[in-house]
From Swiss-Prot:
Residues 731-810 form the BRCT domain. This is DNA ligase. It comes from Methylobacterium radiotolerans (strain ATCC 27329 / DSM 1819 / JCM 2831 / NBRC 15690 / NCIMB 10815 / 0-1). One of its GO terms (biological process) is DNA replication. It comes from the Bacteria.
Length: 810
C-alpha cells in the first residue's frame, strides 16, 4: 500500500461542518468495508481507505462529541453475508493500526514504552511477520478437532464457512501431536499463491467467465462459496498467526505460540522474526519489502507485535485495534502505460466512478489493464478544495501515464507524461447524467468549502438499477422497514427477475411470480456449480423437497411483507436511503412534521426558498460562519474598523484576511456580500436548515432527493401501498428516560445498533463520548479510553449482562 501521511486537520472546521463531513466519511468507510469484506470487490485502494480512516480519527480528536456516533468509528470488517449462517466470535476479531513510515513505527515503540512506564534501555521484544494479503479466518478446535471455521465478518459476528475450510489442504481437520487445550481458536489468513491465481484465471478465461482482479479477491471468493466442491477445486493456502478463545494458555510469548502452532501441523510464516531494537525491525521490513516479488504470494506490509503475552494483556486495546500491534504498510509499485479509454461505472451508492482502460502492463508481478481515476476532479487535475493535483495536468484518452498498485488492490493512475500526449487529444467530458438510468448526476455543494463535492452522484435514487440492490437492502433492514427474512439473496433474485425496481413493488409481490424467480435462480446456480465441480444433477426427490421448502419460505416472506404495511414515519424516512438522512435526522423530521403529506409540502416550499450559490460561498469562507455572515449581510464590509461597533460587522483580523484572500480585494468582497444578500434563504428553507437536529447539509440532501421526479414518484407509490404512523415514542415511565448512555468495547449478546435501539426505545440518549453529564457506561471486552473517561468523571459503569438485567426491569 502507498505510504500515505494523514492530511492536516482543517482547524477552521465548524461543529456543523465537522458533523457533515464525519457522516460522509462514516458512510464512505462502511461502503468500502462492505465491498471489501462482503463482495470481495473493493472499489478504492488501501491507501485511499487509510486516508478516509485517518481523516475520521482526526475529526474525532478535534470534536470528541462525534466519536462513536458513526458506525464506522468502531467498525471492523463488514456485516456477515446473509448467504451464510452466522457465528459469534467468543473473542472479537479486531483490526490493526497502521504506520506508513519509519517515524510512525518509532512512535509506536515509544508509545508502548510510555504506557508500560519502561525506559529506552529496558529490553522490549517485538515479533515482525509478513502481513498476508488474504481473507482472515478463525478456526475453532475442540479437543483437537476442527469444529467451526468463521470469517471475520464485522469483528463480532462472522460467516460460518466450516464445510469450505475443511477442503483447504493447509488446514488440519485434527491437530497433530498433543498438548493443545480443549478449546483452541486459531486465527490466520487464507490466500492464493501467484501461480495458483494465474491458473484459476486461466480456467475462468477458458470458460468465458470474469477474471479475478487479484489473488486476495480470488481467495475470498473461493472460500465464501455456497458449494464446498467449488472451494475444493481451488488450491487455497493458510498461514496461522494469532488466536481467539483458549481454554488454557499455550505459551508465554507470541513466538512461543507460533512454534506451538507449527508442532500441531498449522502452517506459520517462515519469515517471522523477533527483535529488541527498532532499527533492526525496520531493517527486517526493508528486507521483506525487497524480497516480496519473489515470495510467491501477496503481502502488503509487516506486522509488529509485542512478544510477551503478559505485556500484551497489560497494553490492552483502544477502539478497534490492539495497543501492542502495528501494521507497517509497503509503498506502492508502479509502471508506465497508455490510457486506451475512460469509462464510467455507477457504484451501489450512485457515485459515478471513472475507470481508465489501460494497455496491459505488469505492475509488481501482476498484469494491470484497469485503473481507478477516483472522481471528476481527479481526471481534470483538480483536488477536493480546488487545488491543482499533478500540477494541474488532466488525464485524457491516449495519454501515457504512471500507474501505481496502491496496497496491491486497485491500481491508480498517478501521473501524466505531457511530452507523449497525442496532438489530437481532447479533455475528457464527464457525463452529467447517469449511464445506468439517465437521471441527472450532480455534485452537491460542500458546506465546508462552498465548492462542489469531489464525487458526482446519480439522483435517480430509488429507480436507478445500479443502486437498486443496495437501496432495497437498506429499505428492508432492521432499522428500516425491518422485513423479517428478506435477505440479500431474495433481493438479488427479485431484481434479476424484474419483479422489484422500487420499494412499492415489494407490496405487489405475487406467490407464483416469486416462486418462479427463485426456482430459475437456483437452477442457474446449480448448473454453474455442476459445470465447475463436475457433479451430477440432483435427484428429483431432492428437488421436490426443496420445492416444498420454497413454498413455506415464500409464504413466510409474503406474510412478513404484509406485516409491514403499517410503519412509523421515522422508519419510512430512514428506509428511503436518502444521503445524510440517518436515523437521528429521520426522527427529527418525523417529530417536526405531523405526517408525510405535510413534510412533502414543506419540502416543496423549502426548495423554492433555497439560498443562492453566492450566499453558500460566503458562508464557506474559513472562520466566517453563520453569525458573521449575517452581520456582513446586514451591515456590510467595513473598509476599516473605525466605524462604531453597532454599525459594522465586527471582524477579527483572521476573518478579514480570509475574506480578502478569498475574493481578492475590498470591492470584490462588498460585491460578493451584495450578491449574497440577494440570495438569502427564505423562511421555508430555514425551517429545516436552522433546526439543530436537521441542519443545512441534511436539508440540501433532502431537497435534492425530492427534486428528482423519479424519487418523488417512487415515494408517492410507496405511500399508496403502506399506512404511515406517527413516530414511535420513547417509554416515558422507563428508568432510562432522559438519561445519557455510552457503549464501549465489544458487545457479545447484541450488536451495537441493537443496543442503541433498545436504549432509545426506553427514552435514553446514546452518546459517542463520555463526559460528566453521562449517566451510564456499558463496557464490554476491549473497552478503552471511554472506560477511563467514565472512571475519571465518576460515571457508573456496568457490564453488558448488568445492562440487559436493567433493561428487563424497565
Amino acid at each position: 500500500m502507498a505510504a500515505t501521511k494523514s492530511e492536516p486537520l482543517d482547524l477552521d472546521l465548524t461543529a456543523e461542518e465537522a458533523r457533515a463531513e464525519y457522516a460522509r466519511l462514516s458512510d464512505a468507510i462502511l461502503e468500502a468495508d462492505r465491498l471489501y469484506y462482503q463482495e470481495d470487490a473493493p472499489e478504492i485502494s488501501d491507501a485511499e481507505y487509510d486516508r478516509l480512516r485517518r481523516r475520521l480519527e482526526d475529526i474525532e480528536a478535534r470534536f470528541p462529541d462525534l466519536a462513536g456516533t458513526g458506525a464506522a468509528s468502531t467498525s471492523v470488517g463488514a456485516k456477515p453475508s446473509e448467504k451464510f449462517a452466522k457465528v459469534r466470535h467468543a473473542v472479537p476479531m479486531l483490526s490493526l493500526g497502521n504506520a506508513f513510515d519509519d517515524a510512525e513505527v518509532a512512535e509506536f515503540v515509544a508509545r508502548v514504552r510510555r504506557f508500560l512506564g519502561w525506559s529506552d534501555d529496558t529490553p522490549l521484544a517485538f515479533t515482525a511477520e509478513p502481513k498476508i494479503d488474504g481473507l482472515s479466518l478463525s478456526l475453532r478446535y475442540v479437543n483437537g478437532r476442527l469444529d467451526t471455521a468463521a470469517t471475520r465478518g464485522d469483528g463480532e459476528v462472522g460467516e460460518n464457512v466450516t464445510a469450505n475450510a475443511r477442503t483447504v489442504q493447509d488446514i488440519p481437520a485434527v491437530l497433530a501431536g498433543a498438548g493443545w487445550p480443549e478449546i483452541c481458536e486459531v486465527r490466520g489468513e487464507v490466500y492464493l499463491s501467484h501461480a495458483d491465481f494465474a491458473a484459476i484465471n486461466a480456467r475462468q478465461e477458458a470458460a468465458g467467465k470474469p477474471l479475478f482482479a487479484n489473488p486476495r479477491n480470488a481467495a475470498a471468493g473461493s472460500l465464501r462459496q455456497l458449494d464446498p466442491a467449488i472451494t475444493a477445486s481451488r488450491p487455497l493456502r493458510f498461514f496461522a498467526y494469532a488466536w481467539g478463545e483458549l481454554s488454557a494458555p499455550i505459551a508465554e510469548t507470541q513466538t512461543g505460540v507460533l512454534e506451538q502452532f507449527a508442532t500441531w501441523g498449522l502452517p506459520v510464516n517462515p519469515r517471522t522474526e523477533t527483535f529488541t531494537d527498532t532499527a533492526a525491525m525496520l531493517a527486517h521490513y526493508r528486507r521483506i519489502e525487497a524480497d516480496r516479488a519473489g515470495l510467491g504470494y501477496d503481502i502488503d506490509g509487516v506486522v509488529y507485535k509485542v512478544d510477551d503475552l503478559a505485556l500484551q494483556k497489560r497494553l490492552g486495546f483502544v477502539s478497534r485495534s490492539p495497543r501492542w500491534a502495528l501494521a507497517h504498510k509497503f509503498a506502492a509499485q508502479e509502471a508506465t502505460t497508455v490510457v486506451e479509454d475512460i469509462v464510467i461505472n455507477v457504484g451501489r451508492t450512485g457515485s459515478l466512478n471513472p475507470l481508465a482502460k489501460l494497455r496491459p502492463v505488469t505492475v509488481g508481478g501482476v498484469v494491470v489493464s484497469n485503473a481507478t481515476l477516483h472522481n471528476e476532479g481527479y481526471v481534470k487535475g483538480v483536488g477536493a478544495d480546488g487545488e491543482p493535483i499533478r500540477d494541474g495536468r488532466d488525464i485524457r484518452v491516449g495519454d501515457t501515464v504512471t500507474v501505481v498498485r496502491a496496497g496491491d488492490v486497485i491500481p491508480k493512475v498517478m501521473d501524466v507524461d505531457l511530452t507523449k500526449r497525442p496532438a489530437d487529444s481532447r479533455p475528457y467530458a464527464f457525463p452529467e447524467s447517469c449511464p445506468a438510468c439517465g437521471s441527472r448526476a450532480v455534485r452537491a455543494i460542500n458546506p465546508r468549502t462552498g465548492r462542489p463535492d469531489a464525487v458526482r452522484r446519480c439522483t435517480g435514487g430509488l429507480i436507478c438499477p445500479a443502486q437498486g440492490v443496495e437501496r432495497m437492502k437498506h429499505f428492508v433492514s432492521r432499522n428500516g422497514f425491518d422485513i423479517e427474512g428478506f435477505g440479500e439473496t431474495y433481493i438479488e433474485v427479485l431484481f434479476e427477475a424484474g419483479l422489484v425496481r422500487q420499494p412499492a413493488d415489494l407490496f405487489r409481490l405475487d406467490f407464483e411470480e416469486l416462486k418462479a424467480a427463485i426456482v430459475a435462480r437456483r437452477e442457474a446456480l446449480s448448473a454453474e456449480r455442476r459445470a465447475e465441480s463436475g457433479t451430477a444433477e440432483p435427484p428429483k426427490k431432492a428437488a421436490k423437497k426443496k420445492g416444498d421448502e420454497d413454498d413455506k419460505a415464500i409464504k413466510n416472506l409474503l406474510a412478513a411483507v404484509e406485516a409491514r404495511r403499517a410503519v412509523p414515519m421515522n422508519r419510512l424516512l430512514f428506509a428511503l436511503g436518502i444521503p445524510q438522512i440517518g436515523e437521528a435526522t429521520a426522527k427529527a423530521l418525523a417529530k417536526r412534521f405531523a405526517d408525510m403529506p405535510t413534510l412533502i409540502a414543506a419540502i416543496r416550499e423549502a426548495a423554492a426558498a433555497q439560498p443562492g450559490p453566492d450566499w453558500v460561498e460566503l458562508t464557506a469562507v474559513p472562520r466566517v460562519g453563520g453569525t458573521t455572515r449575517d452581520r456582513l449581510l446586514d451591515l456590510g464590509f467595513p473598509e476599516d474598523d473605525a466605524a462604531p461597533a453597532k454599525e459594522r460587522a465586527r471582524l477579527s483580523a483572521v476573518q478579514r484576511e480570509n475574506l480578502l484572500a478569498h475574493y481578492g480585494d475590498v470591492d470584490a468582497v462588498r460585491a460578493a456580500i451584495a450578491q449574497a444578500a440577494a440570495q438569502r434563504p427564505g423562511d421555508a428553507y430555514r425551517v429545516f436548515a436552522d433546526d439543530g437536529e436537521i441542519g443545512p447539509v441534511a436539508t440540501d440532501a433532502l431537497l435534492l432527493f425530492f427534486s428528482e421526479p423519479h424519487n418523488a414518484d417512487a415515494v408517492t407509490a410507496l405511500l399508496d401501498a403502506v399506512a404511515v404512523q406517527p413516530m414511535e415514542r420513547a417509554a416515558a415511565a422507563s428508568t432510562f428516560a432522559g438519561k445519557t448512555v455510552v457503549f464501549t468495547g465489544a458487545l457479545e449478546k447484541m450488536t451495537r445498533n441493537e443496543a442503541k435501539a433498545v436504549a432509545e426505545r426506553l427514552g435514553a440518549k446514546v452518546s459517542g463520548s463520555v463526559s460528566a453529564k453521562t449517566d451510564l457506561v456499558v463496557a464490554g471486552p476491549g473497552a478503552g479510553s471511554k472506560l477511563k473517561d467514565a472512571q475519571k468523571h465518576g460515571v457508573r459503569v456496568v457490564s453488558e449482562d448488568d445492562w440487559l438485567a436493567m433493561v428487563a426491569q424497565g
